[in-house]
């Protein structure tokens, strides 16, 4: 009798991540093993038969996600990214598979390069660390080394969170590069380029009694009329310059974000007792920030066309989804956009408060 199962060249594969070590067998080797009724040692260079025994369901931004992996460290990392989120939206679950394999290097892999062609999104750091996402089917497959997983921030930011968010923002939401804060049920998007001060102003507003939603990535839920935004209020990320505004940041460690990124200070909002947080808000106003060479502090109209293209430029996906997202941006900008020119945080908070309460 000819037995057949997945194993390495050293024996049965108790860890599926080691299964690529067995070489392809010759016909003579297979014939000999069958004649002797010995197990056939099959190679799996494509990782097509890897066992992914660890399974769990998470709710990133409130959307259901089913994950399977051969590493408990992946589940720990996912829990770190999405703790606190419960099911908010009744949608078919996204699917994520993560295979972790051994590697010779213990170094953190390089920053991945990301590309999208039609319904396939890829993110490739090197030949051993990459992800492939089918945005049409809502499924993603990730292959990582143990070295990559050991650098948890890198693994979470560039692969686990990136794959999940790419599915969410090409199906059920419209992503906008904006912080979001809420005062008495009035949500305000704080827009701007990187370094515009979105995180700083959002955090300052939260200290002044606003509800903190997110510091830089807002997701408008598609096909709704109430301009509902969902964000990750579990964390805030600042540039080192923010230490001059907030005393509590003065003793925080400045690190290279996710091992290869920009210098930053990362803060978990759960450690702050004086900050109110929420995952959702209904947006009433869109405000672009301008704190460069301000001669007069004021809130003025901002060109709607400029605001629209600023939001459109980050979108990718299938044509039908892009059509929906374009209409959602038009809905968010239904009342136009504003520009907040300021040099004082206190003045900016007071002026935004007036906008939220009085509508002007």
PLM regions: where:
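A noncatalytic interaction/capping subdomain that flanks phosphate/NTP-handling catalytic cores
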Residues: 2-6, 21-194, 207-211, 218-360
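Conserved lysine of the Walker
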Residues: 198
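Post-Walker A alpha-helix
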Residues: 201-202
């Amino acid at each position: 009798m000819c037995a057949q199962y997945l194993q390495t060249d050293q024996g049965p594969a108790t860890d599926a991540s080691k299964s690529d070590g067995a070489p392809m067998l010759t016909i003579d080797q297979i014939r000999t093993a069958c004649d002797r009724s010995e197990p056939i040692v099959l190679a799996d260079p494509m990782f097509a038969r890897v066992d992914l025994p660890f399974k769990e369901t998470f709710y990133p931004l409130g959307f259901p996600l089913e994950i399977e992996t051969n590493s408990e460290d992946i589940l720990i990392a996912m829990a770190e990214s999405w703790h606190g989120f419960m099911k908010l939206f009744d949608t078919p679950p996204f699917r994520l598979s993560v295979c972790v394999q051994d590697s010779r290097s213990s170094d953190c892999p390089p920053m991945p390069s990301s590309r999208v062609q039609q319904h396939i999104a890829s993110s490739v750091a090197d030949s051993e660390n990459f992800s492939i996402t089918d945005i049409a089917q809502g499924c993603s497959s990730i292959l990582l080394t143990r070295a990559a997983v050991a650098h948890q921030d890198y693994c979470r930011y560039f692969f686990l969170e990136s794959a999940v968010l790419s599915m969410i923002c090409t199906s059920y939401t419209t992503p906008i590069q904006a912080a979001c804060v809420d005062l008495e049920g009035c949500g305000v998007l704080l827009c701007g380029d990187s370094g515009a001060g979105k995180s700083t102003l959002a955090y300052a507003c939260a200290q002044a009694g606003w509800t903190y939603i997110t510091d830089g990535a807002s997701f408008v839920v598609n096909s709704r009329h109430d301009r509902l935004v969902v964000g990750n209020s579990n964390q805030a990320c600042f540039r080192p310059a923010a230490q001059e505004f907030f005393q509590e940041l003065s003793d925080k460690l400045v690190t290279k974000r996710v091992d290869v990124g920009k210098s930053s200070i990362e803060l978990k909002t759960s450690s702050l007792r004086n900050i109110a947080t929420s995952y959702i808000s209904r947006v009433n106003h869109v405000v672009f920030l301008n704190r460069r060479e301000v001669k007069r502090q004021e809130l003025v109209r901002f060109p709607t066309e400029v605001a629209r293209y600023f939001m459109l430029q980050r979108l990718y996906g299938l044509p039908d989804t892009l059509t929906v997202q374009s209409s959602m941006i038009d809905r968010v900008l239904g009342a136009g956009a504003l520009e907040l020119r300021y040099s004082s945080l206190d003045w900016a908070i007071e002026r935004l408060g007036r906008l939220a309460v009085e509508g002007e």
